[in-house]
Swiss-Prot record:
EC number(s) given by UniProt: 2.3.3.13
Cofactor: Mn(2+)
Any GO MF annotation of the entry: acetyl-CoA C-acetyltransferase activity
Family in the record: Belongs to the alpha-IPM synthase/homocitrate synthase family. LeuA type 1 subfamily.
Annotated source species: Listeria welshimeri serovar 6b (strain ATCC 35897 / DSM 20650 / CCUG 15529 / CIP 8149 / NCTC 11857 / SLCC 5334 / V8)
Protein name listed in UniProt: 2-isopropylmalate synthase
Source species, domain of life: Bacteria
Cited Pfam families: HCS_D2, HMGL-like, LeuA_dimer
Protein's cellular compartments: Cytoplasm
Gene: leuA
Ranges for domain Pyruvate carboxyltransferase: 4-266
UniProt keywords, alphabetically: Amino-acid biosynthesis, Branched-chain amino acid biosynthesis, Cytoplasm, Leucine biosynthesis, Manganese, Metal-binding, Transferase
GO biological process: L-leucine biosynthetic process
Length: 512
């Protein structure tokens, strides 16, 4: 039985999804949940890309105690040095170095010859090996690279000290047959194949990321890279929950085992979905809302008689609890804390105290507080107080001629209160125009989405917005409140605060 490592890049590649920007606190929360999930390696970010990303990688490296943390680096000594500095407090640090090997990348992006690429790989892998015990090399755009040159590049990296070789399908170009053959070719040509950990990193542009990852495992890969919910740029990455459950359900075929705690997938999926603002499609494999629903009468009858008739995955396997009891105003702090831990949240004593106080306020306003409400409670607490701004007062009024007016008061981090007013063709536009004046920003609203967290007249509203600033960078915000307008204001303020406080990244080539 072979052991498959799981490498999660939600915090790096997943964050390249347009509109997805996790702050430091959110990244640490996600990383701690990934640790509970049993992920072997967490790719925390790209340390050289910005001071903000460096601090995130350093904070995660310090917080994680039971799995490896890695950072991305180009074949540049400065990148490697920066990664070493960011990861120095990690219990088990690794580094992930990449350089493109396809002709189109070498000619048009790198402007390097094959000989120059090989020399760079040799030098920088050797340089990194002096600083890290585990060095992973990725030949970017491997599946569109000349096969003979790809093998030469991989051999060069191994000879220079690489301990992990990752094969990226950077643009989602390959298919399972071709990808499996690529690993067979590597096994045949690379004499140290069994001594090195080979990995796959697949994108879902043609809808084959999971199938390609499984084909790699079938043909010798011992590490799979991907993200929770498959988030990522363009069509996304390999969904790790799909690979893990496939290996578990079809252990007879793949003969593989992992460290993954399968019943933590639902918590992981919910957390990342809400923090990223990307809802999980109801028909999503493994963790979608319809994954365990049966509408056909024949199917329903069969499932009631014996679930094995139409269910190969039990809901409990991935942490879907259909019998979770709601909390209420009589629930105590211990029960609340236990439920928070079951849902994947790690709270400090002060955070627990503050959150429990808000829970009691919510329980007074609602008959029952469901798990969805509790997720919203945590996210609402985070979204109401951004890095520098907090919504203190909102007033909306009808002006004349169908025009709406809004008065907004915001508290800055230093305690100063700022207030302004503006008008708009509707209440939402008036509120957002006012916030733009207060923040002194010219930003564009790209997406606005509202949903009820639970059913019933006492449901809270959850608003997600995506904005774009003058640098064409997109930011996501979440707002939660019983009042739709207040939730809308909180969401927009959070996104605006992220835009205002985010340090712009160095203008690098897009990392795949």
């Amino acid at each position: 039985m072979k052991k498959i490592q799981f490498f999660d890049t939600t915090l790096r590649d997943g964050e390249q999804t347009p509109g997805v920007n996790f702050d430091v606190k959110e990244k640490i929360q996600i990383a701690l949940q990934l640790e509970k999930l049993g992920i072997d390696v967490i790719e925390a970010g790209f340390p050289i890309s910005s001071p903000g990303d460096f601090e995130c990688v350093r904070a995660i490296a310090k917080a994680i105690k039971h799995c490896s943390v890695t950072g991305l680096a180009r074949c540049v000594e400065g990148d490697i040095d920066r990664a070493e500095e960011a990861l120095k407090e990690a219990v088990s640090p690794q580094i992930h170095i990449f350089l493109a090997t396809s002709d189109v990348h070498m000619e048009y992006k790198l402007k390097m010859s094959r000989a120059e690429v090989l020399a760079s790989i040799k030098h920088h892998i050797h340089y990194a090996r002096q600083k890290f015990d585990i060095v992973q090399f990725s030949p970017e755009d491997a599946t569109r690279s000349d096969r003979a040159f790809l093998i030469e590049a991989v051999q060069t990296a191994i000879d220079a000290g690489a301990t992990v070789i990752n094969i990226p399908d950077t643009v989602g170009y390959t298919n399972p047959t071709e990808f499996g053959q690529l690993f067979q070719d590597l096994r045949r040509e690379i004499k140290q194949f069994d001594d090195i950990i080979f990995a796959s990193h697949c994108h879902d542009d043609l809808g084959m990321a999971t199938a390609n990852a499984l084909a790699a495992i079938e043909n010798g890969a011992r590490r799979v890279e991907g993200t929770i919910n498959g988030i990522g740029e363009r069509a996304g990455n390999t969904a790790l929950e799909e690979v893990a459950v496939a290996l578990h359900i079809r252990k007879d075929f793949y003969q593989a085992e992992t460290n993954i705690v399968l019943n933590q997938f639902k918590n992981s999926s919910d957390l990342i979905s809400r923090l990223s603002g990307m809802p999980v499609p109801r028909n999503k494999a493994v963790i979608g809302g319809n994954a365990y629903a049966h509408e056909s009468g024949i199917h329903q009858d069969g499932v009631l008689k014996n679930p094995d008739t139409y269910e190969i995955i039990t809901p409990a396997l991935v942490g879907v609890d259909k019998n979770s009891l709601p909390l209420g105003k009589l629930s105590g702090k211990h029960a609340f804390h236990t439920r928070m831990e079951e849902m994947g949240y790690t709270l400090s004593e002060q955070e627990l105290k503050d959150t429990f106080k808000r829970f009691k306020q919510l329980a007074d306003a609602k008959k029952e507080v469901t798990e969805e409400d509790l997720h919203a409670l945590i996210l609402g607490q985070s979204s109401e107080s951004t890095d520098n701004f907090e919504l203190k007062h909102l007033q909306v009024q009808y002006v004349s001629g169908g025009v709406q007016g809004a008065i907004v008061r915001i508290e800055e981090r230093d305690g100063a209160l700022i207030e302004d007013a503006a008008t708009g063709s509707g209440s939402i536009e008036a509120i957002y125009n006012t916030i733009n004046r207060l923040m002194k920003q010219d930003i564009e609203l790209i997406d606005y989405r509202i949903q009820a967290i639970t059913a019933g007249q006492d449901a809270q509203a959850e608003v997600h917005v995506v904005i774009k600033d003058n640098n064409e960078t997109e930011f996501h915000g979440i707002g939660i409140d019983f009042d739709v307008l207040t939730a809308s204001a909180k969401a927009y303020l959070q996104a605006s605060g992220k835009s205002k406080s985010t340090t712009k990244q160095v203008d690098f080539e897009e990392v795949k």
